[in-house]
Structures are given as C-alpha cells and as structure tokens.
Regions:
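C-terminal binding/interaction regions
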Residues: 1-25, 87-154
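Structured beta-strand/loop patches that form or line metal/cofactor-binding pockets in enzymes
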Residues: 26-65
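Active-site phosphate/pyrophosphate-handling residues
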Residues: 47, 73-76, 139
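Short, thiol/selenol-centered motifs that function as redox-active sites or metal-ligating centers
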Residues: 66-72
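A generic structural signal for alpha-helix starts
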Residues: 69, 85-88
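Alpha-helical support elements that line or immediately flank enzyme active sites
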Residues: 74-86
C-alpha cells in the first residue's frame, strides 16, 4: 500500500497541482455559443464547459470543474489547449488527446492538431499524460473530453 501511495505521488507534480489549485479559465461564460457537461457517477467528478466562438474559432473557454485534482487540472489544461481551434476540430482534438493519455508512450507532440501550441501548455499536457501509468485514474483526465463530446449550441 505504501508503494502505491508513493507511486501515485508522481502525479502530484508542481505543475499539475498548480492547475488543480488555480485552474485556468475557471469562469462561467454566460454568453457562450456552445456548452457541454459530463459527470462521473462513480466518483462524483463533474465538469461543465462553455465556449465562445468568433468566425468558427474558439475564442474563449469557461470551465466549472469539481472533484479530484486530476479532473480539475486536466480541465484547466484542455481549456487552454483548445483556444484557437475551430469548432469542427474539437472531435479530432478529443481523439488525439485520448490517444496520448491512454497509450504507453507519446506526448503532446503527437497531438498534431496542436502543432502551434505554446510551450507551457505543451508541458502541462505532457505532465497530465503521466496518468497513463495509473489506469484507475485515467477516467479522471478524460472527463473533460466527455464534456466536449456533449457540447450543444446555445
């Protein structure tokens, strides 16, 4: 049991903890063009995401995320990563993000759709991808993609 706790501590990096304690885009966008939400009924994690667009590009993102630190951190990171994408590219982002999280290797460079991503956001994606070594926690980092899949026009 002690080894499991020690191993899990590998996820508690300063960068991930910062996203968890001070999530980016942690606002409700009342004038959002599209929004979505998702809940993990097993653990109680929740996320709601609002997106404003300008000329079909994501111009603002608002998130409300509650639950474990991984859910909050991944929501924060993804909310930064999707800024500037077109709405039609969301599904491709979801697919590539899930592959990065679920496979044994790979990093943010594998998310081709994010080729012009800022270094700090890329580093955050690489940090959150370490969850792949803890299969039971992968769902925590994928809940944000479920909310994105559930987006609807307002």
């Amino acid at each position: 049991m002690e080894n499991e706790k020690q191993d899990l501590s590998l996820l508690y990096t300063p960068l991930i903890l910062e996203h968890s304690k001070n999530p980016k885009n942690n606002v409700v966008l009342d004038s959002a063009d599209i929004s979505g939400s998702a809940v993990n009924p097993f653990c109680g994690d929740e996320i709601s995401i609002q997106i404003q667009t300008e000329r079909d590009k994501i111009s603002s993102v608002g998130i409300e995320s509650t639950g474990c630190f991984l859910n909050i951190a991944s929501s924060s990171i993804v909310s930064q990563a999707i800024l500037g994408l077109t709405v039609t590219n969301i599904n491709e982002f979801i697919k590539q993000y899930r592959l990065m999280i679920q496979r044994q290797s790979g990093n943010s460079n594998d998310i081709v759709i994010l080729k012009n991503l800022e270094d700090d956001i890329r580093k955050s994606l690489d940090e959150i991808s370490k969850v792949r070594d803890f299969p039971i926690r992968i769902k925590c980092t994928l809940l944000v993609t479920m909310a994105l899949q559930n987006i609807k026009m307002n």
